[in-house]
């Protein structure tokens, strides 16, 4: 019996320190891989500049902050003829948080770079004037900082280039993830496409009850414009196109017409 206890004691002496080392390493690795935390200065910027955050209920602000911090940490930030200040990162990330708030773990991972231009810029072979662009193959989202600010300067006009370009990114992110981890419910997405086809036709015929003409370009542009109206004019969207609005609520898991600051 004494021999058995001796063997057990040796095993425990060896295994316990090893287990503690493994657990400690795992905790440290988990810490390194854990979510980014929002700095106090970034939180102050959110409170001062970010209208979506200001409109978020107090109980939901920690989640909003988490998405902002993670988005800032995940992306490579570049300026095209402009220095990228921390306030710029915070406002773009707050726009992303507004769009992504209803998803459990969608970070737009295919888009690694955010490029900010000082204002509208010319791009492409024809030198077309742009307020923003999304390039899925390059993993790039580009936004005109001046136009982004103007969009937030009039938050009820249904025009916000930040929401527009990030909606494009979300649309492409789903398509790029469709074979592995799609996050837009397939039945809701099909209902969206069916309703959108009819509304696009009405836009092209000048009979739209809500959306601006540009939404009739194609399905991708229709979705991006609809997202702008969804967050900036939700009551009107719901009143004019209730079926389409309800489907988008389900797709994004958000109900902005019922949002509260409580």
PLM regions and their residue ranges:
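N-terminal signal-anchor transmembrane alpha helix of single-pass membrane proteins
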Residues: 1-35
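N-terminal topogenic membrane-targeting module
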Residues: 25-81
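Active-site recognition of the HExxH zinc-binding catalytic motif
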Residues: 57, 157-174, 224
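Peri-catalytic and regulatory segments of divalent metal-dependent proteins
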Residues: 60-72, 76, 80-100, 104-110, ...
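Metalloprotease/metallohydrolase-associated module, dominated by Zn2+-dependent proteases
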Residues: 72, 89-104, 119-143, 147-153, ...
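Generic beta-strand structural signal
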Residues: 112-114, 139-141, 159
């Amino acid at each position: 019996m004494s021999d058995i206890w001796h063997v057990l004691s040796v095993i425990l002496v060896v295994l316990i320190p090893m287990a503690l080392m493994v657990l400690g390493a795992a905790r440290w690795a988990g810490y390194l891989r854990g979510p980014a935390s929002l700095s106090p200065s970034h939180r102050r910027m959110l409170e001062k500049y970010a209208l979506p955050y200001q409109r978020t209920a107090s109980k939901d602000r920690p989640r909003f902050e988490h998405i902002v911090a993670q988005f800032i940490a995940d992306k490579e930030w570049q300026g095209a003829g402009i220095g990228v200040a921390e306030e710029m990162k915070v406002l773009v990330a707050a726009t992303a948080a507004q769009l992504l708030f209803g998803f459990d773990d969608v970070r737009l991972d295919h888009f690694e770079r955010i490029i900010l231009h000082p204002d509208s810029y010319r791009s492409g072979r024809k030198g077309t004037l742009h307020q923003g662009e999304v390039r899925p193959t390059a993993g790039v989202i580009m936004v005109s900082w001046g136009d982004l600010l103007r969009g937030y300067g009039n938050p009820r006009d249904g025009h916000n280039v930040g929401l527009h370009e990030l909606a494009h990114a979300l649309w492409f992110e789903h398509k790029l993830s469709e074979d592995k981890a799609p996050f837009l419910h397939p039945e809701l997405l099909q209902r969206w496409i069916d309703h959108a086809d009819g509304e696009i036709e009405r836009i092209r015929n000048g009979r739209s009850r809500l959306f601006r003409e540009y939404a009739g370009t194609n399905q991708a542009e229709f979705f991006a414009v609809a997202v702008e109206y969804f967050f900036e004019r939700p009551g009107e969207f719901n009143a004019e196109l209730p079926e389409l609005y309800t489907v988008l609520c389900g797709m994004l898991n958000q109900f902005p017409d019922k949002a509260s600051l409580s």
